């Protein structure tokens, strides 16, 4: 038997560290991408919530005159805050609305469409002058 390597356990382990390293790097890259997607979805949820809150507040004074005026004011404010108004109604003098916001990162949109449809976090808000 030579002095270099023994013929026992682990004799065929040459290159195992490279394969293990490549798998580890791949797992870390996927984890980082998923973390970015989650962060982007959370940011979109916050954007939708802020837009809904501000839209309801903007529509509340106009709700005293008509539902159309209230929803027009809410639509403008929601759009200016980077979201889309989904529903708007005046109920008992309160403006009630929902808004949604799309993720901004392209990989988030791509992944959400790959998983069965565009994911748009939605938020609801209401405001009135009472």
Residue spans for each PLM region:
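Low-complexity, flexible helical/coil segments
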Residues: 45, 91-94, 123-125
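Short, structured secondary-structure boundary patches
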Residues: 31-35, 97-113
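Alpha-helical assembly-interface signal, strongest on the long, hydrophobic N-terminal helix that forms
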Residues: 1-70
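Low-complexity, S/T/G/P-rich flexible repeat/linker segments used as non-globular hinges
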Residues: 2-4, 108-130
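Residue-level preference for non-acidic, small/hydrophobic
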Residues: 52-53, 78, 125
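Short amphipathic secondary-structure patches
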Residues: 2, 56-105
């Amino acid at each position: 038997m030579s002095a270099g390597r023994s013929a026992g356990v682990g004799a065929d382990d040459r290159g195992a560290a490279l394969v293990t390293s490549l798998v580890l790097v791949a797992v870390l890259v996927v984890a980082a991408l998923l973390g970015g997607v989650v962060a982007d979805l959370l940011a979109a949820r916050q954007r939708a919530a802020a837009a809904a809150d501000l839209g309801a507040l903007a529509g509340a004074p106009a709700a005293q005159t008509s539902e159309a005026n209230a929803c027009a004011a809410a639509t403008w404010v929601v759009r200016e805050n980077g979201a889309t108004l989904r529903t708007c109604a005046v109920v008992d003098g309160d403006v009630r609305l929902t808004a949604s916001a799309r993720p901004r990162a392209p990989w988030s949109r791509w992944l959400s469409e790959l998983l069965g449809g565009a994911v748009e976090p939605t938020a609801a808000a209401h405001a009135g002058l009472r």
